[in-house]
């Protein structure tokens, strides 16, 4: 399961691009009439996008949905942002698991840094989908807060639910 989390961001909220939600609402989120923690398979992997400013909130979501944090990717962008304390040039993709899911086979373990250009607002690099597909081939895939559809993935967001 991959998720782009629409955290509220104080005075820097992406509200002009899409509606945002408080962390508590994301933790209690229902899709297709059921809590996310019940939608995800008993044995599942969660890939959760976040930024430095929302890292602690992302960990709350992981816990609320019944997952255990394991590792992360860093998406290093080609353009630098404004930042608060430092000028941010990356996003973080947290990896969490629940149930009987182990790490990917050694041949399917990618490097932790993804180098890819920044695209439209909130659009993640296609390389990430390909990494997830290689890491866990054969597992069903669901993207929450999706901006696009992708073959072999179920998508849910404020644009569609397929």
Task: Give the residues covered by each predicted segment.
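Class I S-adenosyl-L-methionine-dependent methyltransferase catalytic core
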Residues: 1-162
